[in-house]
């Protein structure tokens, strides 16, 4: 067993995961502990990881079959983009960076409104993984909501 340990944030959800290098294949025993922590805490943060797209895809696939990135599946015009790598079918790049005048990702400097990833699908994905390479000093926050707490603490419609 590795030195894997889980540190709850103390908030309504989330925990930090320490002692695992996601750039390497994660064995079944370690993944079982990660999956258990995810079921308990709903959001897991793995700080200090150095991953490329393939590594991210490999770890993500442990949670289930990967879904195509909506923008690449529906509307990405490859002739207008540097996005030619097969990984772009599975890994969404959200960036304001341009290379040779072409965006390397989607959304640019725009903020997303509050949403649940791909909730418009009849069978939404089991999980979403976010890997940040560069985050601004101010802003760039990602929020999470514990819908179980909302469900169990909200008044009944009959109240």
Regions found by a protein language model. Give the residues of each.
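Flexible glycine-rich active-site/ligand-binding loops centered on an Asp-His dyad
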Residues: 146-150
């Amino acid at each position: 067993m590795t030195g894997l340990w889980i540190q709850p944030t103390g908030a309504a959800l989330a925990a930090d995961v320490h002692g695992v290098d996601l750039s390497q294949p994660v064995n079944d025993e370690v993944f079982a502990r990660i999956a258990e922590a995810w079921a308990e805490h709903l959001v897991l943060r793995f700080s200090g990881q150095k991953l490329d797209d393939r590594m991210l895809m490999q770890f993500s696939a442990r949670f289930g079959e990967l879904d195509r990135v909506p923008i690449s599946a529906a509307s990405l015009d490859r002739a207008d983009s540097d996005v030619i790598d097969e990984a772009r079918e599975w890994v969404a790049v959200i960036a304001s960076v341009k290379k040779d005048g072409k965006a390397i990702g989607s959304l640019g400097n725009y903020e997303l409104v509050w949403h649940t990833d791909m909730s418009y699908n009849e069978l939404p994905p089991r999980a979403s993984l976010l890997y940040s390479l560069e985050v601004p000093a101010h802003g760039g926050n990602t929020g999470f909501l514990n819908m179980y707490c909302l469900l169990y603490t909200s008044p009944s419609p009959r109240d």
